[in-house]
Amino acid sequence: MKKILMIIILSLFLSSCGEKEESEAEEETTTELEGTWKTACYTNSDNSTNIDTLKFVGNVYTRKDQRYSDTACATVYKLEEITYTYSEGSAVTFMSGNTGRYFKITLGSTYKTTPQSASAVNAFNSSSKCGFSNWELNTAKDCDHDEDDAGSNLYGLYQLVDGDKLYASIAEDSYPNSVNTNDTESTFTKQ
């Protein structure tokens, strides 16, 4: 009888330890995208250029949009930093054999903007960007997203190649059904 009682107590103890380990593991979300990813220099429609950086830490996804005023990504103009909540969906295998996943990102209520040139400071102050008219060089401010945008969801699909090349597509209303592997703006290399 004592042996049976000891087995029951030991079983209860071990199962409660297992539950604790499982719940702790659930709190720490790690994805295959964990880390920092960066685009090459690409040209915008106004002939300015960008280099974008994505950083994934757990369920937080941060996008840094580095804008340049020239055509060679040499002269910084402004930096925008936008933070999202990130969640993964179903896994996907592409015709190429590469894998990926559907994902959803939720926009926070604010983003950071930093003017990095005198012309950006002047433009920000003239337009009272984000309601401020006291912008200073290389000094970030928190800006509010439009009411309609704050908390909104964006839907995406990514393809991962060899663990260090990421192709991503994002849409506003529904999950995309493909990714463009020839678009510099949506091609990221692991740093």
Model regions and ranges:
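Bacterial Sec-dependent N-terminal signal peptides
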Residues: 11-37, 188-191
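Sec-dependent bacterial lipoprotein signal peptides
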Residues: 1-15
